[in-house]
Amino acid sequence: MTASPRAFDEFYREYGYEIKSEDIVDGGSYHSNSVVLTEKYKDYMDFTQKYVAKTVRMLTDIVHSYGKEAMMFLGDSWIGTEIFGEHFKELNLDALVGSVGGGVTVRMLSDVEGVRYKEGRFLPYFFPDTFFEGNEDNAVAELNRNWITARRAMMRNPLDRIGFGGYLSLAAKFPKFINRAAEICDEFRYIYDTVKTQTPRNFAKVAVLNSWGKIRSWMCNMTAHELWYQQSYSYQGIYEALSGLPVEVSFINFDDVKNGKLKDYDVVINAGDAGTAWSGGENWLDEKVVTEIRKFVYNGGGFIGVGEPTAVQYNGKFFQLSDVLGVDKECGISLGEDKYNIEKHSEHFITKGIKFPVDYGEDKKNIFALDGTNVIDIAFSDRFIRKVNVGEVKMATSVYGKGRSFYITGLPYSAENAKLLYRAILWTGNKENLDEKSYCENPLTEAHFYGDRFAVTNNTDKKQTTVFYDIDGNAQTLELKPY
């Protein structure tokens, strides 16, 4: 965020109260994406967006006066040009382009409204760190990895154009790379021509709940463009999985919850570390928030928690919706309360076709199940064997009124975890009857339905066999070539 004395003065005149440097510095956090938003910071962001939109509009008008198009590159910093903000359309841009790190960044671009077309720059960039003598096979492998993750998202909502960046003279020395890039371009054109004319079928409406909501759509738990961080990859996998699943995805904040928006969704996901914007911090102390979500689930909605959902220590609980989730975290405060629910029941609709052990990434410790919760997976220490107050729950389900919840300690991206998340969405959303509709049993393959045709993809570099179910549940075995 930017700041200046003039901006502070104009903010005061418009909003009627003062903003100070400390409101931006925020004790040294500088209001990074992971910091829980304050109302004052929201106002200042809106103020900045309006100013930038007015300024950029002058520039785009100049560009258009010369008969040219105005395109913005979505980089690591875009102060005031929030692509999912209320004022983005006022910039009057023609196009948006950004780097593609996988499915999440595809959707971060392709879901934007207010421009005529969106473009993705694929990896690897044509730079000497990749395009040096003897490294062609690695360059092709990186291209394939990037395309396979991006393609999952393209099957749901494709970009309008794809390209590369860097020095063409370097890429020209790698004929295998050029040939593979040409194949990918042909495949992209076919996907685009199909998906842009026929909306893919979605089987559930999912809302991701955090402090930011829509303005940080597809940017949750992310630093820059899908850079890997040990502290965030266990959450990042949720959004990578969602980017290519047959579900409609929205991003909502706590004001949306209080304003009755939950009725528009089948399942709500809350994921993140305690105290962060992604989990929600002290928003979970708002009685209206927890009441609205309890009511939503009790009446048949689904709730999925990952990591430390609804987390803030208060009133003897760490997970404020532990009654809905069926689990809580022992923080050393309730050790005197015996915990007997440690029996594992791994067979469940959610885990059908899923291989154990499940990859939980960085995981979470000291999660315990409340009485009545169904424990799907739990880990025990070999230091002490007993029947009470032992074990750490990894995965669990719970029933709350007519609704259901699912908890998991972490969900890094993999084909198996994407399938697990999809099945969790169907189960919590009371949609098990849609299980074998446009569906592949082999998690390395996926199916998409477009009204009059299906697409079945192989997301690996090896041949795959899968049982495929059409929209009516009819099964057939398919042999799929690599990619």
Where would I find each of the regions flagged by the language model?
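A glycine-rich, often tryptophan-bearing local segment used as a flexible ligand/cofactor-contacting loop or short
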Residues: 280-357
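Active-site clefts of carbohydrate-active enzymes
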Residues: 34, 111-141, 170-174, 214-217
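Acidic (Asp/Glu)-rich catalytic clusters
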Residues: 87-88, 106-118, 154-158
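Extracellular ligand-binding/catalytic regions of CAZymes and related secreted enzymes
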Residues: 146-149, 158, 166-205, 241-244, ...
